[in-house]
């Protein structure tokens, strides 16, 4: 007697597989890196094969890509957008200016996006090539697959 095949997995693996293969970035382009980020949306790099679809609304996004110089006036707005994103959410800091302030070490610039929001992946360069952003998304997918999808200390809701 032959038995039907059974798929054994954990709920964590299933949720992480779905999350890692449907990344929807919120593009937050501020300077030169934004041009390279726009190039990744073209047919040459084809982010659709990774399940990545650029979104304009933070409520539909789970990844924020910060590309370029972050000024102190933009910092509050960027934090508000980050807070509007649903959980789980990830942040990619793209370029030297977003990572460390770059060459703009002035009173008006934030010296690194990680002072405003928690950053998961840093992309070095001025400006990083589209291939680098593509690689960063692949690294983020791997990071999501290895993470815990279900938090043990999550508060229980009473309905």
UniProtKB/Swiss-Prot annotation:
What is the recorded name of this protein?
A: NADH-quinone oxidoreductase subunit B
According to the UniProt record, what class of enzyme is this? translocase
Its cellular-component GO annotations read: plasma membrane; respiratory chain complex I
Q: What is its EC number?
A: 7.1.1.-
* Main subcellular localisation: membrane
State the free-text cofactor note.
Answer: Binds 1 [4Fe-4S] cluster.
Species annotation: Helicobacter pylori (strain G27)
InterPro entries on file: NADH_UbQ_OxRdtase-like_20kDa (IPR006137), NADH_UQ_OxRdtase_20Kd_su (IPR006138)
